[in-house]
Each structure stands twice: as C-alpha cells, then as structure tokens.
C-alpha cells in the first residue's frame, strides 16, 4: 500500500497551477544569473597557479579541488537536486526549481572547477578519485551518501541547506583569501568562486524554504507533533555538530604545508562556524557557536546581496543579468546594410 503524503507539497499533481510562487521566483532568479564556466578565462591564472603561489597555498588549493567536483556532482545529481528532492516534492514548480539548480551544479560549477584543474594539470582520473584514499575526505562523502539515503523530506532538505550553505563555503572562504587583503592571485578563478558563492547561498536558502514549507504543512495536518519537532531538532543539531567536526578536519588538511600568506586556519574555522550558525537560523534552530562573524565573512556578505562596481583589477564577469526581452528587440535595417 503506497504511503500517504504528509503534506500538500509532498503530494503529486497532474495540474500545472503553481501553489508555491516563491519556487517559480527562485527558479527564474537562478536562471537569470546563470554563468557558463568557460566565460571566466581561468586559463589566464596559469602563471599564478604554477609560479606565483607558494607551496603552502598551492597545496591548499589542490586539496580543496580534489573533492569539490565530487560535491557538485552529488548535490546536482540523483542524490539531491537532480533526483531525490524532485521526487520528494513532486510538484511542477518545485521540479522546475530542482531542474535549474541541478543544471547550475552540473553545467556551470563542476565544469568550472574542472577548468581550474586543467590549468594546474590535475584533471586526471587519479586526481578525481584520490579523495577515496584519504580517510577524512572519504568520511565526508560517506556522510553525504547517508543523508541522501533518507526518505524524510525534512532531513534531506536540512542536509542540503548545510551542504550548500556551510560545507561548500569552507572551500570558498579559503579561495577568497587569494583575492583579499591586497592580494590579487588567481583573480579569474576567484571570480568563479564569487559566482558560485552567490549560487550556493541561493540554493541553501531554497532548500531551507522547502524545509520550512514542508514542516508547516505537516504541522497543519497533524503530521508533525511536538515530539516530532524535538526529534527533528535533535537530528539537525547532531547534523550541524558532525559537519562542524568534519569541516574543521578538512580545513586542517588545507594547511598541512605551513606558510600560507592569504588566510589562516583559525580564520577559516571561524568562517565555518559562522556559516553553520547561518544555516541553523534558516532552519529555525538556535546557533551552535557563540562567536560574531569574522574577517572571512566580511569578504563575502557584501557580495552575496549586492553587485560590485567593476574596476580595472576586478576580473569578475558575473555582474550581469540577462534581462532583455526578445519581443522588444528591433531590427535596424541601416545597420545591416553596413555589414
């Protein structure tokens, strides 16, 4: 006997009427800022990657890059946006949102990281699977598989909110140091990190919105009791605790070689704590860490909600929106005759 859905948002429909207009708005927002990985000119950073970064900095970049592509493939693939979440919420507007987010992960972010690896000469089969030989990185992937296996929509969306809003941001914080404090290393690559950060922040918020909507509807139907809320809160707090421990261990791998000039382990761990607190708040939970936002947070938060004014040194090519309307385009015959 099939399981009865616990809420409207978990109930399939043959209609195309959007009951959740916010999901349509977020899908349109994400589509409007889609950026092709090939546009950024990461190849121009080859000199930095090969000669201008010191061994400590290059080690950190290579270590982070060794697992980032795997993250993107899982988050955008069947495990989450490209499969699981669309099945948990079988409504057309939610599936539209899932499709556009999956496309961003698989058709923008993952190729972008691959271009960086190609420039460094690391885009090989061995490189993309070397995380399996590292017990810390392998444990992280095992954790992602575990939460992806859950059939509880609330647990899955909470996990995705953390993965996109905290886990990925640890790597972003590390990379951002190369273009802060007066440093201008790998500027084209960091431009992609800026774009990824905006995208992933949006995805984390979308997952949290799905979480909150689902929980609200379940409660209204009597399918989310006080006891359920206590269990859910405990699950989320444990998830946050495990992620914090994992991230700090992974962060330490980035600094195994001493001498990084652009960011410290303490600063990165502080940023990880800040991001975990932010996601907890999105999920209606109390903060886990009693620390204010640190220096790395300051590098990001102005950019997540505003558009930078480009200058001579700003390599970012992501400060645009495709907001033209086809029906408003006109054909100027006099210009055509000049060709």
What are the residue ranges of the model-derived segments?
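Non-heme di-metal
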Residues: 1-339
């Amino acid at each position: 006997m099939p399981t009865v859905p616990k809420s409207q948002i978990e109930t399939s429909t043959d209609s195309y009427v959007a009951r959740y207009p916010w999901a349509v708005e977020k899908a349109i927002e994400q589509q409007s800022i889609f950026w092709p990985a090939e546009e950024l000119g990461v190849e121009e950073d080859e000199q930095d990657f090969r000669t201008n970064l010191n061994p400590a900095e290059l080690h950190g970049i290579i270590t982070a890059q060794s697992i980032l592509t795997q993250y993107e493939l899982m988050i955008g693939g069947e495990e989450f946006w490209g499969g699981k979440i669309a099945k948990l919420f079988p409504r057309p507007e939610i599936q539209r949102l899932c499709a556009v987010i999956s496309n961003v992960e698989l058709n923008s972010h993952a190729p972008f990281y691959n271009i960086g690896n190609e420039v460094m000469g690391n885009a090989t089969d061995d490189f993309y699977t070397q995380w399996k030989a590292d017990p810390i990185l392998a444990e992280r992937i095992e954790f992602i598989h575990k939460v992806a296996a859950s059939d509880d929509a609330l647990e899955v969306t909470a996990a995705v909110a953390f993965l996109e809003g905290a886990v990925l941001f640890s790597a972003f914080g590390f990379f951002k140091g190369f273009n802060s404090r007066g440093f201008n290393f790998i500027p084209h690559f960091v431009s992609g990190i800026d774009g990824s950060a905006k995208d992933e922040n949006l995805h984390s918020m979308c997952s949290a919105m799905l979480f909150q909507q689902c929980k609200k509807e379940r409660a209204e139907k009597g399918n989310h009791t006080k006891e359920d809320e206590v269990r859910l809160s405990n699950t989320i707090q444990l998830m946050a605790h495990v992620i914090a421990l994992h991230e700090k261990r992974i962060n330490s791998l980035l600094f195994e070689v001493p001498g990084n000039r652009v960011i410290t382990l303490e600063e990165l761990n502080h940023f990880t704590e800040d991001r975990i607190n932010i996601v907890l708040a999105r999920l209606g939970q109390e903060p886990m860490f009693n620390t204010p936002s640190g220096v790395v947070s300051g590098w990001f938060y102005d950019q997540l909600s505003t558009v930078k004014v480009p200058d001579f040194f700003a390599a970012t090519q992501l400060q645009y929106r495709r907001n033209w309307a086809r029906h408003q385009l006109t054909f100027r015959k006099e210009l055509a005759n000049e060709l």
